[in-house]
Regions:
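Helix-turn-helix
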Residues: 20, 28-67
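Amphipathic alpha-helical packing segments from all-alpha helical-bundle domains
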Residues: 98, 109-118, 122-124, 131-158, ...
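Generic hydrophobic, amphipathic alpha-helix propensity
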Residues: 17-25, 42, 67, 71, ...
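C-terminal peripheral helix-coil segments that are non-catalytic and often amphipathic
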Residues: 1-8, 102, 143, 147, ...
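Conserved hydrophobic residue
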Residues: 34-35, 133, 162
Length: 216
């Protein structure tokens, strides 16, 4: 294997420092909020000089936006898991009920993850100052989740398993049946989330109520 040259080593060191900065900044933003986090604190926690931080990021706003967009982009694997569940072959009402329960449980688990809750809380708090970032977060997270659910409902409706005249509304209703007060409770009560058994109960109830309204 060829040894790395000076340029490659320099790029590697730069990338490492950049990662140290973004990791430290994310932890501080989530813990203290945007306004109460300073570039001095970020530099100290990252173990670099403030000059190094400013060499990588023009200002705190730029750093915050890059971090938030980067974390939001990591939701792809969750959506892939939800898509795989939603694409499970379904041919009977019982199949549909089981698939809805699995979809509901994974959806609830994803939203109840502490990093997700912390980021959501932070984005909401800074939405007025960063409206485009808040919009990006919504489009990449909640909206994509609803799009996925709507697509699954359309397929099941075409199979004759559901009768929902407004699929987007039905997708929103399913999402709220799943998340409901659990999400609000977790956001406003320091991340307190339902225990596994309660999540299963919520998922089953959501599937049952949804099918009571739209099942054939």
């Amino acid at each position: 294997m060829d040894e790395l040259g000076p340029a490659e080593l320099a790029r590697g060191r730069t990338a490492l420092k950049r990662r140290q900065i973004t990791d430290a900044a994310l932890a501080l933003f989530l813990r203290n909020g945007y306004d109460k986090t300073s570039m001095d604190q970020i530099a100290a926690d990252a173990g670099v000089s403030k000059q190094t931080v400013y060499k990588q990021f023009a200002d705190k706003e730029t750093l915050f936006e890059e971090i938030a967009r980067g974390v939001t982009g990591k939701s792809d694997h969750i959506l892939d898991e939800l898509t795989a569940i939603a694409q499970t072959p379904v041919s009977t009402g019982d199949d549909l009920r089981k698939t809805l329960q699995r979809l509901a449980r994974r959806y609830l688990d994803a939203v109840m993850e502490q990093p997700v809750l912390s980021l959501r809380r932070l984005i909401i708090a800074e939405a007025d100052q960063f409206p485009e970032l808040a919009s990006h977060y919504y489009q990449q997270g909640p909206q994509r989740g609803l799009d996925l659910i709507e697509s699954a409902l359309r397929r099941w409706s075409e199979q004759g398993l559901l009768a929902a005249p407004d699929l987007r509304l039905a997708a929103s209703q399913f999402a709220y049946l799943v998340l409901g007060s659990s999400q609000d409770h977790a956001l406003f009560q320091s991340g307190q989330t339902p225990r596994p058994a309660e999540r299963t109960r919520i998922a089953k109830a959501a599937a049952s109520m949804f099918l009571a309204a739209y099942g054939r």
